Structures are given as structure tokens and as C-alpha cells.
């Protein structure tokens, strides 16, 4: 069973991730891509699923980071580095393939989504590392 520190870190990082996603997708990408391509993007999706999805993504990242922090280290910089690696692993092929697979998916949006997602994972990694910091053994 995970510690209270783990769950608080997931909660805080999940809230921050949702706020950032809300701003990026409603203020920037929404008007630029989503609303201008109503055939490409579903307009009837319940927004609750985006919130749930962010919390699930943060939980999975936290779980993985908890397992590999002994390799990466547990500092904020180490969490950001782990986030960068995970973000590249997840985002780079995903968004480029979306452009290759779906008619009308803008190539520019593939790169915007890739870069934004990597930065998202870096931010989440830094938050999780800061909050899940493992203390050294007592002297």
C-alpha cells in the first residue's frame, strides 16, 4: 500500500496537470485546432473524462517513478528528467502517428502536442519528485 505522501503527491500533481490542460486546451488549442476542426474532434465528450484521464496518467507516472527513482534519483531535477524520458517515450510516436493515421490531423498539431506533452510530463515529474522525496536514513 502506498504512503500518504504518495497519494498527496498524486492529488497535487493531478490538480496542477488538470489546470494546465484546461488552460492549454480551452484557451490555446481549443480555438486554434479543436473548434476549427469539428469533424476531426468530438464535440460531445464529457469533460469529466479528461479530468479522470489526467489523474490516471499522473497516478501511473507516480507509480512508475516510485519504482525507478532508485535509478533516476529522487530530486526535483531527477523527476523532471524521468518526466522528459517518459514524455518522449509516450508522446513522440503517438502524436506523429496520429498525423499519419487520421485524415485532416494537422502535422503542426502533432509537434505542438508532442512538445506540450513532454513538458507536461517534465512538470508532473518535478512535482511528484518534490513531494515524494525519500528521506535518507537517520544518522
Model regions and ranges:
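Juxtamembrane/disordered regions of integral membrane proteins
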Residues: 1-139
Amino acid at each position: 500500500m502506498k504512503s500518504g505522501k504518495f497519494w498527496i503527491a498524486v492529488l497535487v500533481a493531478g490538480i496542477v496537470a488538470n489546470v494546465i490542460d484546461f488552460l492549454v486546451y480551452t484557451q490555446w488549442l481549443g480555438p486554434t485546432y479543436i473548434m476549427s476542426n469539428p469533424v476531426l474532434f468530438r464535440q460531445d465528450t464529457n469533460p469529466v473524462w479528461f479530468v479522470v484521464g489526467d489523474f490516471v496518467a499522473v497516478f501511473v507516472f507516480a507509480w512508475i517513478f516510485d519504482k525507478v527513482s532508485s535509478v533516476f534519483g529522487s530530486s526535483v531535477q531527477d523527476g523532471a528528467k524521468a518526466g522528459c524520458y517518459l514524455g518522449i517515450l509516450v508522446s513522440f510516436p503517438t502524436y506523429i502517428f496520429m498525423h499519419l493515421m487520421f485524415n485532416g490531423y494537422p502535422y503542426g498539431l502533432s509537434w505542438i502536442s508532442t512538445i506540450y506533452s513532454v513538458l507536461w510530463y517534465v512538470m508532473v515529474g518535478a512535482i511528484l519528485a518534490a513531494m515524494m522525496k525519500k528521506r535518507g536514513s537517520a544518522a
